[in-house]
Design a protein with these regions (language model features):
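Basic helix-extension-helix modules of the SAP/HeH family
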Residues: 379-443
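PP2C/PPM-type serine/threonine phosphatase catalytic domain
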Residues: 1-374, 378, 447
Length: 447
């Protein structure tokens, strides 16, 4: 029987070496098949939505890391696409686990968080499978399930500061105390068998489909068949779960996990009063936006009943008999590699801009240090370049405009007006002439 532990303080898990699990009482060498599928919110088809996912399978097929990140839709009101943040977070995590196989998943998430230095925020869940063992990390309301023979062996719990305000990671959050990878919950389970399934998904699945229904969909796929086509099996499960979640999201009267949560929350509110969320956490400043991964208001779920329209993303991992399924396992791995590379190509412009911002930020920090403390700048050429804004332009800006320009440049937006002006005045023009939101807004304001 599998043993599950869900805990707040994480330890490094165990992996490495040959991977074995039991099948009908016999020890077999295992591999992992994986597949991810998703669809954007119907209103976000043009942008591709704000969810992202990845799956990385080791070359020997024994280990897989599955991950999802759910971009925070509230940032759209600030002109920020959190989908880019989620995609870069997943891409950075995929690269990290491919090169650093001994890191814990909390360390992987920390590395990805430090790499994804562009505006936005996301919830996330990562899981690693090896032999008879799975471990993972959760931040916010993304989650994981482990299923065997129509039974849910493990179900993670979402993290909330208050109703509809999940924990989330962000670069340069708008206000409040940011959540960090150290705030993640961790989970582990041993005793996995061949044909056990691990699901990692955004709340678009778990808000619309009950765990028992997820298990039923998996059971109907009959993983125990003798054809060994585990690549097709994982693809089928991901597709069926996505279809079911999509149907529920559009159903305004269906019984769903989200509808039940809303009923419970309304019972806690003053009679006749509006729904209220708490004031803690990163999205304190975004409370008017709903403080969740999309607009979690009544119009999204039929006045409180039925499903919830959202991005839906699902990654399926299947523990398999490597000797019987090796060809299909390799096909599955190739599909995972292809998806990561497609994401990399899609995000190439955003990542190039992110790298320019990092370089610019290093120069700004050096110039800012000299302006405030009188110490030498970190880079000698920073002061030789022309300022992005003249001192007169900076002095005429109010606090909102200052914060907007700094945020567009990926720079800190906290502090008094005088400090914000010093920070923006220290920004130099990109020596390569690369455009930025700040440069563009300056051109527009001068017309």
């Amino acid at each position: 029987m599998a043993n599950a532990i869900v805990r707040k303080a994480g330890m490094k898990g165990r992996w490495g070496g040959s991977a074995h699990a039991s099948s009908n009482g016999l020890q077999v060498e295992t591999g992992v098949a994986a597949c991810g599928r998703g669809r954007p919110h119907p209103r976000k088809k043009a942008s591709g939505g704000e969810d992202a996912h990845f799956a990385v399978v080791s070359e020997d097929l024994s280990t897989a890391v599955l991950g999802v990140a759910d971009g925070v839709g509230g940032y759209a009101e600030r002109g920020v696409d959190s989908g880019d943040y989620a995609r870069v977070l997943c891409l950075a995590a995929a690269d990290c686990v491919a090169s650093e196989t001994t890191l814990s998943l909390r360390e992987v998430l920390r590395d990805a968080h430090e790499t994804a230095q562009l505006p936005g925020a996301a919830t996330a869940c990562f899981a690693r499978l090896h032999g008879d063992y799975v471990e993972g990390v959760v931040i916010g309301d993304a989650g994981a399930r482990v299923i065997r023979n129509n039974e849910v062996l493990l179900s993670t719990s979402a993290q909330y500061h208050a109703f509809d305000q999940p924990y989330q990671l962000a670069h340069a959050p708008p206000s409040g105390k940011p959540d960090t990878p150290d705030d993640t919950s961790t989970f582990e389970l041993d005793g996995l068998d061949v044909n056990d399934v691990v699901i990692v998904a955004s709340d678009g699945l778990f808000d619309n489909v009950f765990d028992s229904e997820i298990a039923s969909v998996i059971e109907s796929t009959q993983f125990g068949s003798n054809d060994g086509d585990v690549d097709n099996a994982t693809t089928t499960v991901a597709g069926r779960l996505l279809q079911l979640a999509d149907e529920r999201a559009s159903n305004t009267v269906a019984d769903t996990p989200r509808a039940r949560e809303l009923v419970k929350e309304r019972e806690k509110q003053p009679k006749g009063g509006p729904m209220r969320g708490g004031g803690a956490g990163l999205l304190r400043g975004l409370a008017n936006f709903g403080g969740s991964n999309s607009s979690n208001n009544d119009s999204e779920n039929g006045g409180g009943g039925g499903g919830k329209q959202d991005d839906i993303t699902i990654v399926v991992g299947l523990v398999s008999d490597k000797n019987r399924c090796e060809e299909s396992l390799r096909k599955s791995r190739e599909g995972c590699i292809s998806h990561v590379e497609q994401t990399r190509e899609m995000m190439r412009p955003a990542m190039a801009k992110m790298e320019r911002r990092k370089q610019l930020r290093a120069k700004v920090e050096g110039a800012f240090t000299e302006a405030v403390e009188g110490t030498p700048a970190k880079t000698e050429d920073a002061l030789e370049e022309q300022p992005l804004f003249s001192r007169e332009e900076v002095e005429q800006m109010d606090k909102a405009r200052l914060r907007s320009e700094l945020e567009a440049l990926g720079l800190p937006t906290s502090g008094r007006v005088e400090r914000l002006r010093l920070r923006l005045a220290a920004v130099k023009q990109d020596p390569e002439g690369a455009s930025s939101k700040g440069q563009q807004s300056r051109k527009e304001s001068s017309k």
